[in-house]
């Protein structure tokens, strides 16, 4: 059981009425709180919840509608995303109760101050290195417009500016990260065919790929609903076509790909997690056509070349700088 869920269950007497659990982990919490429904924006956790509790959790960037009298937000990493989620929940709970639970190292003390916009926050519990806060909604806000909260910026490229649309919570929100900047300079001479931007975030790499290889089919994949929507907005802002997939890792990707291009993720909330990246290296060959290429950027300290060579083929370093390296390998 997730420690945040354990803290909630210490106060289960507070959750006897219809309840929405926002950002809930894929554990036993829905079994323990049969009156609760879930709202998830993580495709992997949503798949696990669907398998165990069919119809009791929704995958979306917007809060589901329902006759909730209270809601719990599991604190996400991003402050901007927390603002949006709290406003979305508070808008549905005039006079109701909004709870916030999170790890101390995840910033729950700081985030509890964000509850003050809706009433007087109270700390209810502190255990398992987590805290539980509550506020009664005295000032219910209007429903927030997610797209109005997007950060939009122009990326100057040799073939013209690219318009990027980044929603709250998306990796490197509102700016181009250093790893992707290095990889953008190494997208030449990719095999023609079906291209995949794995871990697409706001869709920068995928949009550049479609612009440079217009005859190629493009897919973009991310585990996060806000990233998936950001990528769709970025493609639309540039008049580009592409399939955007919500899936937990490379197993959800198409097969017979000509190339996989990636700035792979290695954070899950406040925790470092290399599982998705390592699984990409281990399983890329199953998704590439013969002669297909994996091209990715990674922190220089990560020992990826041995993994790539073990599971795919000879690994070349195409470029390095600013603490990152660009690796390339082809399926034989």
From Swiss-Prot:
A Pfam family assignment: MTS_N
Catalytic activity of the protein: guanosine(1207) in 16S rRNA + S-adenosyl-L-methionine = N(2)-methylguanosine(1207) in 16S rRNA + S-adenosyl-L-homocysteine + H(+)
InterPro entries: DNA_methylase_N6_adenine_CS, Mtase_sm_N, rRNA_ssu_MeTfrase_C, RsmC/RlmG, SAM-dependent_MTases_sf, Small_mtfrase_dom
Top-rank EC class of the record's enzyme: transferase
GO annotation, cellular component aspect: cytoplasm
EC number: 2.1.1.172
GO biological process, one term: rRNA base methylation
MF (Gene Ontology): 16S rRNA (guanine(1207)-N(2))-methyltransferase activity; nucleic acid binding; rRNA (guanine-N2-)-methyltransferase activity
Keywords assigned by UniProt, alphabetized: Cytoplasm, Methyltransferase, rRNA processing, S-adenosyl-L-methionine, Transferase
Localization per Swiss-Prot or TrEMBL: Cytoplasm
HAMAP family: 16SrRNA_methyltr_C
Family: Belongs to the methyltransferase superfamily. RsmC family.
Protein name: Ribosomal RNA small subunit methyltransferase C
């Amino acid at each position: 059981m997730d420690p945040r869920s354990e803290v909630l269950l210490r106060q289960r007497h507070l959750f006897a009425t219809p309840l929405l659990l926002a950002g809930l982990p894929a554990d036993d919490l829905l079994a323990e709180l049969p009156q609760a429904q879930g709202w998830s924006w993580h495709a992997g956790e949503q798949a696990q919840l669907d398998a165990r509790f069919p119809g009791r959790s929704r995958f979306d960037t917007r809060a589901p509608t329902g006759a909730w009298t209270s809601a719990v937000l599991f604190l996400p990493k991003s402050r901007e995303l927390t603002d949006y989620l709290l406003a979305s929940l508070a808008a549905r709970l005039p006079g109701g109760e909004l709870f916030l639970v999170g790890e101390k190292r995840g910033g729950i003390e700081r985030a509890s101050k964000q509850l003050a916009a809706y009433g007087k926050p109270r700390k209810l519990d502190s255990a398992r290195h987590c805290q539980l806060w509550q506020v009664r909604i005295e000032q219910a806000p209007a429903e927030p417009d997610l797209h109005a909260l997007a950060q939009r910026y122009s990326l100057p490229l040799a073939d013209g500016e690219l318009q990027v649309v980044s929603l709250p919570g998306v990796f490197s929100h509102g700016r181009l990260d250093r790893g992707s900047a290095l990889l953008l300079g190494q997208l030449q001479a990719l095999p023609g065919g079906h291209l995949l931007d794995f871990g697409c975030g706001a869709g920068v790499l995928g949009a550049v790929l479609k612009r440079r290889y217009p005859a190629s089919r493009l897919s973009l994949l991310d585990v996060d609903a806000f990233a998936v929507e950001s990528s769709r907005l970025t493609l639309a802002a540039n008049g580009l076509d592409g399939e955007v997939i919500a899936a937990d890792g490379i197993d959800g990707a198409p097969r017979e790909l000509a190339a996989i291009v990636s700035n792979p993720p290695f954070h899950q909330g406040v925790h470092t997690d290399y599982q998705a990246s390592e699984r990409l290296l281990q399983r890329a060959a199953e998704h590439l056509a013969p002669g297909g290429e994996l091209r990715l950027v990674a922190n220089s300290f990560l020992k990826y070349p041995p993994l790539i060579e073990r599971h795919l083929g000879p690994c070349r370093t195409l470029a390095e700088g600013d603490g990152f390296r660009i690796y390339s390998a082809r399926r034989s």
